């Protein structure tokens, strides 16, 4: 039985989809004015794993992740760069997709863009106006009247009086209450804008997600996710808008990924510890980064550091090492080993417990140990266990590559040696061993070790990996 921790109830709840066998998920995507950073990577990988697991359980998943392609930040960046909004957003959408592919993130079912849903956004604002939840200010903006929504604050567990008193909200004479937020922004000269009943303008950020999610998934859908910083005000405002407009419960399960820190500090440009995905991928293999993100429970805070990434590399290499000499034979394996079923059950129990990837990864390590033991005793059993391990790891998006690509790198030099030179040294060492010249064999092993190349001897022959 799958249980999901809902941020709304603040407890684990049995997952009951609205429609049997089908799941609708909406995740707030990127505002495309810059490259994706590590926090984005966590959300991307987290909900990729959740979607993979739901599909593995047999659900037909409609996974919607939006793109915000009109926003103050986008307009300001385009102006500063001297380029069109279309050119800016197209460039960073392409970059986002490149980052996703590198991290092994599968494409969502649909990826709606705000600019493609202006009609739906205007229609939702009009419904809010008609019901008395929104008002047209004298400056041309349209605001949501927070005081009209009795349940405002139910997601973030804040009371409206506390929000008014505690929030650092700029005084705006156009607002009836400081907590009110904009639904439609009147256009400034030269800005990107659309015609509306309230004049030329563009949508506010919050209404974009309400309109797109309900358009794609219906007035009520199963799961809404995002980063921890979106719970308030963005998701709180989404609830207020959507439930006021439709009269229906908006979302059944609210899921929020944990925060990402860097060397135990909040990631920020001002602290100089802000990393884009591509900057991190310049230092570490993509699967190592994915393993790092997947090996912690999605709700827990994680701390990025070089030490943590090296530990992730070591852990992933241990898993790959266990199947390395078996990899070429896994395609023909039929899983008859009863122990595979036991591990599969443990893996599913972990994932059914609010997608506990940390415990699921621990199951993979137990399987790796069993594979290593079986390799010495029963190769058929080892192959069956290895195949089962790789199949389970696919849910996490791990262990799907040829082990050599991680262990040796993508054709890069190691310690100044090319792959061809390393292979030549291994051939020389094999010849020395055949001639029982063990001193020469040890000399070559030590030389390669100094260069950062470790040799592994097995009955299949000698393989190598980066130190």
From Swiss-Prot:
GO terms for biological process: cysteinyl-tRNA aminoacylation. Binds 1 zinc ion per subunit. Gene3D superfamilies: Cysteine-tRNA ligase, C-terminal anti-codon recognition domain, HUPs. It is found in: Cytoplasm. ATP binds at residue 269. SMART domains: DALR_2 (SM00840). The keyword Transmembrane helix does not apply. Its main location: cytoplasm. InterPro entries: Cys-tRNA-ligase, Cys-tRNA-synt_Ia_DALR, Cys-tRNA/MSH_ligase, Rossmann-like_a/b/a_fold, tRNA-synt_1_cat_dom, tRNAsynth_Ia_anticodon-bd. The keyword Ligase applies. Keywords: Aminoacyl-tRNA synthetase, ATP-binding, Cytoplasm, Ligase, Metal-binding, Nucleotide-binding, Protein biosynthesis, Zinc. Its cofactor is Zn(2+). It comes from the Bacteria. Its EC number is 6.1.1.16. A motif ('KMSKS' region) lies at residues 266-270. Monomer. Belongs to the class-I aminoacyl-tRNA synthetase family. NCBIfam families: cysS (TIGR00435). This is Cysteine--tRNA ligase. It comes from Hahella chejuensis (strain KCTC 2396).
């Amino acid at each position: 039985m799958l249980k999901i921790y809902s941020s709304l109830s603040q407890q684990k709840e049995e997952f009951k989809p609205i429609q049997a066998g089908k799941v609708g998920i909406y995740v707030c995507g990127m505002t495309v004015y810059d490259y994706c950073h590590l926090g984005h990577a966590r959300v991307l990988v987290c909900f990729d794993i959740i979607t993979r697991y739901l599909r593995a359980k047999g659900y037909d998943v409609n996974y919607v992740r939006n793109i915000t392609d009109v926003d103050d930040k986008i307009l300001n960046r385009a102006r500063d760069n001297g380029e069109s909004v279309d050119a800016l957003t197209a460039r960073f959408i392409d970059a986002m997709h490149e980052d996703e592919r590198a991290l092994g993130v599968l494409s969502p079912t649909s990826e709606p863009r705000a600019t493609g849903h202006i009609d739906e956004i205007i229609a939702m604002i009009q419904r809010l106006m008609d019901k008395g939840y929104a008002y047209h200010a004298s400056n041309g903006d349209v605001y949501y009247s927070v005081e009209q929504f009795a349940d405002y604050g139910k997601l973030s567990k804040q009371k409206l009086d506390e929000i008014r008193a505690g929030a650092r909200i700029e005084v705006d004479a156009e607002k009836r209450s400081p907590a009110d937020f904009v639904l439609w922004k009147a256009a400034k000269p030269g800005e990107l804008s659309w015609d509306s009943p309230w004049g030329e303008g563009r949508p506010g950020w919050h209404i974009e997600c309400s309109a797109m999610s309900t358009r794609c998934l219906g007035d009520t859908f199963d799961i809404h996710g995002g980063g921890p910083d979106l719970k308030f005000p963005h998701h709180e405002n989404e609830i207020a808008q959507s439930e006021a407009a439709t009269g229906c419960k908006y979302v059944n399960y609210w899921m929020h990924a944990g925060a990402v820190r860097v060397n135990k500090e909040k990631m920020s440009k001002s602290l100089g510890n802000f990393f884009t995905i591509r900057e991190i991928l310049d230092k570490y293999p993509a699967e190592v980064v994915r393993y790092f993100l997947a090996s912690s429970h999605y709700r827990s805070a994680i701390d990025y550091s070089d030490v943590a990434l090296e530990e992730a590399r070591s852990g992933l290499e241990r898993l790959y090492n266990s199947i390395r000499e078996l990899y070429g034979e896994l395609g023909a394996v039929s899983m008859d080993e009863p122990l595979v079923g036991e591990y599969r059950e443990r893996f599913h129990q972990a994932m059914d417990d609010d997608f506990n990837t940390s415990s699921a990864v621990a199951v993979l390590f137990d399987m790796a140990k069993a594979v290593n033991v079986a390799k010495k005793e029963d190769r058929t059993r080892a192959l069956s266990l290895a195949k089962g391990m790789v199949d389970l790891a696919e849910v996490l998006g791990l262990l799907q590559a040829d082990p050599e690509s991680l262990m040796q790198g993508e054709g890069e030099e190691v310690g100044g040696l090319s792959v061809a030179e390393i292979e030549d040294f291994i051939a020389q060492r094999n010849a020395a061993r055949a001639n029982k010249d063990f001193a020469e064999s040890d000399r070559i092993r030590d030389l390669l070790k100094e260069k950062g190349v470790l040799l592994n001897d097995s009955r299949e022959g000698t393989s190598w990996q980066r130190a």
